[in-house]
């Protein structure tokens, strides 16, 4: 009961950070994050990005599913663009652009 009360008292951004922290504490080798920053403020997004970066530095695999092209380009090494349930392109995030992602996605 206390965890439900505590969690519900948090902002959306803090709820996201708590969930991410709980996952990291599991010491998993790979993390799958779907829209990890949806609905949270810029400050909380930065903290989530830092947590993702820490996972990568600690040799953890991180797969991010996101519709935010800028976000993906900023935190990922590779971008896999899906179209109609199939892989349309695999891009180097450091060289790719949002326009290129949209080109393959549409």
Q: At which residue positions do the language-model features occur?
A:
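Short, small-residue-biased leader/transition segments that mark boundaries at the very start
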Residues: 1-5
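A short, proline-enriched helix->beta-strand linker immediately N-terminal to the Walker B motif
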Residues: 25-29, 35
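ABC-family nucleotide-binding domains
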Residues: 34, 41
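Helical segment within the ABC ATPase nucleotide-binding domain
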Residues: 46-58
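Conserved H-loop
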Residues: 60-65
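A short, surface-exposed alpha-helical micro-motif characterized by mixed small hydrophobic
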Residues: 72-74
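Short, glycine/charged-rich "phosphate-handling" switch motifs in NTP-dependent
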Residues: 78, 90
């Amino acid at each position: 009961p206390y965890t439900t009360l505590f969690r519900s008292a948090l902002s959306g951004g803090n709820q996201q950070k708590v969930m991410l922290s709980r996952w990291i504490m599991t010491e998993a080798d790979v993390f799958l994050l779907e829209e990890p920053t949806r609905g949270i403020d810029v400050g909380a997004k930065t903290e989530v990005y830092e947590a993702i970066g820490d996972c990568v530095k600690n040799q953890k695999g991180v797969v991010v599913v996101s519709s935010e092209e800028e976000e993906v380009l900023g935190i990922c090494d590779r971008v896999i663009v899906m179209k109609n349930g199939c892989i349309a392109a695999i891009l180097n995030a450091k060289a790719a652009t949002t326009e290129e992602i949209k080109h393959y996605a549409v």
